[in-house]
Amino acid sequence: MSIIDKLSLVEKTYEDIVQKLNDANIKDNRVIQDLMKKKSEIEDIVEEYKKLKVVLKEIEESNEMVNNPDTDKELKDMALLEIEDLNQKKEDIVNGLRLLLLPKDKNDGKNIIVEIRVGTGGDESALFVGDLFRMYTRFIERTNLKMEIIDTSPTELGGYKEVIFSVSGKDAYRTLKFESGTHRVQRIPATESGGRIHTSASTVAVMPEAMESDVVIKDEDIRVDIFRSSGPGGQSVNTTDSAVRITHLPTGLVVQCQDEKSQHKNKAKALKVLRARIYEKEEAERKAKEAKERREQIGSGDRSERIRTYNFPQNRVTDHRINVTLYKLDRFMDGEITEITDALFKKEQEDMLASYSD
């Protein structure tokens, strides 16, 4: 199917939706909201297609002028220049439409759960968990997104074994989904007297927040344990048993939350994280199956799970997936990460274009 055929189908779908929205007999709010959502999803495509049709018409008219034996040379020359400009305009619109027509990641618009954990490197890894957490906090402060801390496990040296937080707002998953993976840090620890550079790593998981309709958790499938909250070094930070640990028996997934003073709030947050982890597990299995099928067709393109290196002595950050290096790590750690996240999103689109090209 050519791109024009695809655009014609989208335009027909759009016209059908508009007709239904103008139908006074449709009064169900859920139906109306669903139609409005579908309309907004393809509105930009239809508008760009209208522009394309205008340009194609102008190209046709200019070609007729050039091919007309009665047209004088000066007008033909002007028409040829006009055709050149119009063809460039057409190419720009078509390229934009190819991107708009790409299949959307169904999770892009969802809120997310982010988990940052220690990897290799002991105390240095725990300190870097804190650095990454501050980096994402500052990044989110620069956007219209909102963050809520779900659970933290601080260490005595000021780092974290684990930080879990949620991010809500427009396209939260699309904005941060490329942060999942192993983040490697190279720097001289404060305790290192010899000035040697140490390498450690922390891991980041970005999961779409699952709705109750996405993942159903049965009461008989979970075990809930209540215990007293603890801080760095294991000392008690709460006089009541308000911390909650939930074990999902079918998968063996375990989530705990102790940041709230209320047991009920901790349980609700823990369930939200558990639901996201189950959803992510199911999505990963589905994607692995699709990737396996695709590899059988086009060969393997696996990459290392290490996605990024942060080199503090050189003030350098390198993203290994796109081979981009920036020498402004200080600003990157202050939340200025969009240069790389935008490049990753662009690469995803380019890869999809290559896969879905006509």
UniProtKB/Swiss-Prot annotation:
It is found in: Cytoplasm. Keywords: Cytoplasm, Methylation, Protein biosynthesis. SUPFAM superfamilies: Release factor. GO terms for cellular component: cytoplasm. InterPro entries: PCRF (IPR005139), Pep_chain_release_fac_I (IPR000352), Pep_chain_release_fac_I_sf (IPR045853), Prokaryotic/Mito_RF (IPR050057), RF-1 (IPR004373). Disulfide bonds: none annotated. Peptide chain release factor 1 directs the termination of translation in response to the peptide chain termination codons UAG and UAA. The modification N5-methylglutamine is found at residue 235. GO terms for molecular function: translation release factor activity, codon specific. This is Peptide chain release factor 1. The gene is prfA. It comes from the Bacteria. Methylated by PrmC. Methylation increases the termination efficiency of RF1. It holds the Pfam family RF-1. Belongs to the prokaryotic/mitochondrial release factor family. PROSITE patterns: RF_PROK_I. PANTHER family: LD18447P (PTHR43804:SF7).
